[in-house]
A protein has these predicted regions:
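Glycine-rich anion/phosphate-binding loops
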Residues: 5-20
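Short alpha-helical functional segments enriched in proximate histidine and acidic residues
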Residues: 22, 70, 206
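A generic structural signal for solvent-exposed, polar alpha-helical segments
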Residues: 18, 39, 102, 131, ...
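Aromatic-rich peripheral "rim/lid" segments of glycoside hydrolase catalytic domains that contact
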Residues: 1, 11, 25-29, 34, ...
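Glycine-centered flexibility motif
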Residues: 5, 83, 182, 231-234
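Glycine-rich, acidic and aromatic/proline-enriched surface loops and short helix-turn segments
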Residues: 22-25, 163
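Noncatalytic carbohydrate-binding groove/subsite architecture in carbohydrate-active enzymes
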Residues: 9-13, 29-31, 55-190
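Outer-membrane beta-barrel translocator domains and adjoining extracellular loop/strand segments
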Residues: 46-47, 134
């Protein structure tokens, strides 16, 4: 959003207030507010253009803090999340930022201006989207300097939120949701379908064992042509495949 004028800022605040008020009922509630999409790819997903990372994060933090303050008027238990791709210490796309640098700035800015409870929404796809065997991700290591964070090395996120300097007020762990994740089946051949299920099972065992990872949301219910790779739990919902369940459906 444009946070540089009073009018545009008030319009954004009004939209947030409308949503927060409408969806704060026990029967119809937004509990998790993910602020924008894959902000490390802000040059593609927002309207700011190619900006220095500090300029981008200053605007982003104001957007997130505004959402936090407004929704907490209606629901003290709601959470706001910074959304990022599977890049960590590498720009995951042309003109993108490094996620670790963005999180460092989040810490610096929020503590300087007053800390608040923001959380992490990670898109922990395999480093190569077309390869469901995430354990083969050579660029995903267990070092805090790893290039990518995927289902292979979720321990990096778990360790990051366990460090006191990254915690809310120094002692409260921030939430981590894998808010858009999944493995693909490169084809509908049996081996590819089994590899997709195995890739998820591999990741799930890690999620289940790591206290710092709260949960996972799968990318897509069905395969979709617009995704580039078949990431669904079920096959294409066309006349040929009719949304037939893939092995990963049962695993999930």
């Amino acid at each position: 959003p444009n946070m540089t004028t009073v009018e545009s800022t008030q319009c954004y605040a009004a939209a947030l207030d409308f949503l927060a008020q409408r969806y704060s009922d026990p029967d119809m509630r937004i509990a998790h507010w993910i602020i924008h999409n894959e902000v490390d790819g802000g040059i593609h997903w927002t309207n700011m253009g190619d900006k220095p990372i500090a300029t981008f994060m200053d605007t982003y933090l104001r957007s997130m803090r505004m959402c936090y303050n407004i929704v907490h008027q209606y629901d003290q238990h709601s959470e706001v999340f910074i959304s990022f791709s599977h890049g960590w210490n590498i720009a995951a796309g042309g003109g993108w930022y490094k996620v670790r640098d963005m999180l460092d700035l989040m810490n610096q800015f929020s503590k300087a201006e007053g800390d608040f409870f923001w959380s992490l929404a990670c898109h922990s796809y395999p480093a190569q989207l077309g390869n469901p065997c995430t354990w083969d991700d050579a660029q995903a290591t267990f070092s805090m300097d790893t290039e990518y964070v995927t289902l292979k090395n979720l321990e990096v996120l778990d360790k990051w939120v366990g460090i006191s300097q990254n915690q809310y007020k120094g002692n409260i762990r921030r939430s981590v949701w894998l808010s858009e994740a999944g493995t693909c089946s490169p084809s509908y051949e049996d081996k590819d379908l089994q590899d997709q299920a195995a890739g998820f099972a591999y990741g799930w065992k890690k999620i289940n064992a790591l206290d710092g990872i709260n949960g996972i949301q799968w990318h897509s219910w069905f395969d979709h042509l617009g995704d580039g790779v078949p990431l669904g739990l079920r096959k294409y919902s066309d006349e040929e495949y009719k949304g037939e369940a893939k092995p990963v459906w049962t695993t999930y």
